[in-house]
Amino acid sequence: MIDLSPLARRLAGTPLATWANGLQAQLDAKMEKGHGDLERWQSALDALPKIQPSEIDLINGLRLDTDCDDATRAQMRTALMGLSPWRKGPFDLFGVHVDTEWRSDWKWSRVAPHLNLEGKRILDVGCGNGYYMWRMLGAGAHSVIGVDPNWLFFCQFQAVQRYLSEPSVWHLPFPFEDLPANLEGFDTVFSMGVFYHRRSPIEHLLALKDCLVKGGELVLETLVVEGDQHQVLVPEDRYAQMRNVWFLPSVPALELWLRRAGFSDVRCVDVSVTSIEEQRGTEWMKYQSLSDFLDPNDHSKTIEGLPAPMRAVIVAKK
């Protein structure tokens, strides 16, 4: 059983206290339903060596280390490989380099300079395996809660958390929709790589705003296209082989949507074309990746002939 009482204690006396007190029952019910692969992933977690880090670096990356022998490292590698595919990272865990599909550290280096997370209560929507949550903690956050219904990502988070018995970072295997309306308890809310999967983009923005305290900050990272405030791409079918992509606005259109949803001080702090160096297949993620989804003769287009992935980071205030 995963004990959420430290989370409830951490959030006592905050606007999130009532919600936090009900999370244990919600998690227990979710765990009881489970997932077909959960037993296999749990076996991988159980196979992790029982060691403690003497060195922890969450500022320059995510690195844990201590004196350990080759046999321990081999055991660590085998157990972590049992939780493949690893998409967000990289992680350096006791001499084992988990070379994930995404160089998420590159994205973080583009986002982090524009934020002050010191002492903040943070919600990470669609948090994946929690890579960014640990980086948020490294940036001084008071507490970080991530929600993502993917059970493999939940188990990958557990693999790291067992070496960082940190009462400030929590992964809840829930969809964002399971959060109560009008929480209004987080200082900063992140939605990175989620927006384009939403059928109702304005509804998503309003739901994110509902999670923030007055004056709180939204960090929104999503796929965009070139153009003015009237330019929005809605793919006919797939986009870069993804079925569930709905709206790719231009940056001016996205800024307009945010203002319309009631946000202020809306700023675009970064726009980057995703390269095949930033997202690629590795031995830790052996499936197709970005290079397979682009036109082989013209990397400025997807395989469907649409503009290649370009991502913007927008920061806005409630």
From Swiss-Prot:
Record family assignment: Belongs to the class I-like SAM-binding methyltransferase superfamily. CmoB family.
UniProt keyword tRNA processing present: yes
Gene that this polypeptide is encoded by: cmoB
InterPro entries per UniProt: CmoB (IPR010017), Mo5U34_MeTrfas-like (IPR027555), SAM-dependent_MTases_sf (IPR029063)
Enzyme Commission number, as recorded: 2.5.1.-
NCBIfam families noted in UniProt: PRK15068.1, tRNA 5-methoxyuridine(34)/uridine 5-oxyacetic acid(34) synthase CmoB
MF GO annotations: methyltransferase activity; transferase activity, transferring alkyl or aryl (other than methyl) groups
Protein name, entry field: tRNA U34 carboxymethyltransferase
rRNA processing recorded as keyword: no
UniProt-listed Pfam families: Methyltransf_9
HAMAP family (UniProt xref): tRNA_carboxymethyltr_CmoB
Subunit structure: Homotetramer.
GO biological process: tRNA wobble uridine modification
Entries under Gene3D superfamilies matching the protein: Vaccinia Virus protein VP39
Binding site for carboxy-S-adenosyl-L-methionine: K88, W102, K107, G126, M192, Y196, R311
Keywords of the record: Transferase, tRNA processing
Reactions accelerated catalytically: carboxy-S-adenosyl-L-methionine + 5-hydroxyuridine(34) in tRNA = 5-carboxymethoxyuridine(34) in tRNA + S-adenosyl-L-homocysteine + H(+)
Summary of the function given for this chain in its UniProt record: Catalyzes carboxymethyl transfer from carboxy-S-adenosyl-L-methionine (Cx-SAM) to 5-hydroxyuridine (ho5U) to form 5-carboxymethoxyuridine (cmo5U) at position 34 in tRNAs.
